[in-house]
Amino acid sequence: METDNGKGLILAVASSVFIGSSFILKKKGLKRAGAIGTRAGYGGYTYLLEPLWWAGMVTMIVGEAANFVAYIYAPAVLVTPLGALSIIISAVLAHFLLKEKLKKMGVLGCVSCIVGSVVIVIHAPKEQTPNSVEEIWNLATQPAFLIYVAITMSIVLALILHFEPLCGQTNILVYIGICSLMGALTVMSIKAIGIAIKLTMEGVSQIGYPQTWLFVMVAVTCVVTQLIYLNKALDTFNAAIVSPVYYVMFTTLTIVASAIMFKDWSGQDAASVASELCGFITVLTGTMILHGTREEEQQQASSEHVRWYDSRKSMNEEHLVSLYSPEY
């Protein structure tokens, strides 16, 4: 493996450990905050006063910082799929700390994620680093990528303005869709900023270029939007479901965006590209197994208690509406 790819690999793995842990810390913080004030899923910001939520935020920031540097050294097609490791971390911790059980099929899902990640690492392409932020800007303003951005923003606006009020509290794809679409743009801008910082540290200053600051503005806007809707998703839905669904959507969209903007697969033979895709599909399969395991458990709980299952989360556990409740 190339030296730069090796550095990116180590940083990506470390990032996954921190980010996976942060999901659990933030989840526990959100549950505590929801018990004393308006929940984040309903527009509340009580969690900002909860120390445990801030501990999760700090952990996530450390993980994202490691991820940020990883994108400087390695292509998105290598770094992004390794985020599956954070799902394993969060699933295991959720099993012990949130009492969200991880059964045999869940373990199989974790193993699939690891196997797929290894295949991707072995066949990852070596990235050609741009020589200036202007060169990155030229990549970002090519017609194909501009069309991608236009489609992305149209979908995000539709989700926020139309679908969130309509079904945001019952359909996980609304909140996660917004996070993932904005997340793909975040990665592209963060990668541009990282390369600009690297070039500046090597003596080729990129600070004076207006394109550098445009990328910073895009990154800040996208990150803030991601955080708002990720908090809503975590507060409304089960953490063991949010993590894999977010990963699948975010990773897929990021790889698509990177392939369009940076042409990651240019120069690779068909066998290597096919191997990477197979590895990616294996990882996706693992995350879907984890997701399916959680859904099966929830349906069983609903059946055992003769209740209707509501996909939303209460302040304590899954929100179940009993047929025999005196309220109904």
Curated annotation (Swiss-Prot):
The chain crosses the membrane at residues 5-25, 52-72, 77-97, 105-125, 143-163, 176-196, 210-230, 241-261, 270-290. GO terms for molecular function: magnesium ion transmembrane transporter activity. It is found in: Cell membrane; Early endosome. Pfam families: Mg_trans_NIPA. Residues 1-4, 73-76, 126-142, 197-209, 262-269 are extracellular. PANTHER family: MAGNESIUM TRANSPORTER NIPA6-RELATED, PTHR12570. This is Probable magnesium transporter NIPA6. It comes from Arabidopsis thaliana (Mouse-ear cress). The lineage of its organism: Eukaryota, Viridiplantae, Streptophyta, Embryophyta, Tracheophyta.
